[in-house]
């Protein structure tokens, strides 16, 4: 299982990586493995400003639909257009081409309250 050091994690198995004033958000390798084959990603919140831990979309797998929670407060500025045709990118490359949204955090310092790789490993191994 992959735990990149350059991202922050949530207890709900999302990750966030800040690049300038924009952050990429996705689900973790652990989450995609637990979910199984992803067949559809729905992000109806593009252009909206949400609070931390609010639902920003859903991921559909063969057996269920799971909510996606925003790691920090901010504006959802873009969804990954590649996922419309290729939702399996989330399974193949969850920290790269399988990112879900780009967002503008309301306060970048909020990322400091999230888990680092070691903290997240402890969550999934608990």
Curated annotation (Swiss-Prot):
What detail does the entry give on cofactor binding? Answer: Binds 1 lipoyl cofactor covalently.
Q: Does the keyword Lipid biosynthesis apply?
A: no
- InterPro entries (alphabetical): 2-oxoA_DH_lipoyl-BS, Biotin_lipoyl, GCV_H, GCV_H/Fam206, GCV_H_sub, Single_hybrid_motif
Keywords (alphabetical) are: Lipoyl
- Report which residue ranges the record marks as coiled coil: none
Gene Ontology cellular-component terms for this entry are: cytosol; glycine cleavage complex
Domain spans labelled Lipoyl-binding = 22-104
Residues with PTM N6-lipoyllysine: 63
> Does the record's keyword annotation contain Cell membrane?
no
Q: Which NCBIfam families does the UniProt record give?
A: gcvH, PRK01202.1
Q: Which family is annotated?
A: Belongs to the GcvH family.
> What does it do?
The glycine cleavage system catalyzes the degradation of glycine. The H protein shuttles the methylamine group of glycine from the P protein to the T protein.
- What is the protein name given in its UniProt record? Glycine cleavage system H protein
- Record organism: Bacteroides fragilis (strain YCH46)
Name of the gene this protein is made from: gcvH
């Amino acid at each position: 299982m992959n735990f990149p050091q350059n991202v922050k994690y949530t207890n709900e198995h999302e990750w966030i990586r800040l690049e300038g004033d924009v952050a990429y958000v996705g689900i973790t390798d652990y989450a995609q493995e637990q979910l199984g084959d992803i067949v559809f990603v729905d992000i109806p919140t593009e252009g909206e400003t949400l609070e931390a831990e609010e639902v920003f979309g859903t991921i559909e797998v063969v057996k269920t639909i799971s909510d996606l929670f925003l790691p920090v407060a901010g504006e959802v500025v873009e969804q990954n257009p590649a996922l419309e045709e290729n939702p399996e990118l989330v399974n193949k490359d969850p920290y790269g081409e399988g990112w879900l949204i780009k967002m503008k955090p309301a306060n970048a310092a909020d990322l400091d309250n999230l888990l680092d790789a070691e903290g997240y490993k402890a969550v999934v191994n608990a």
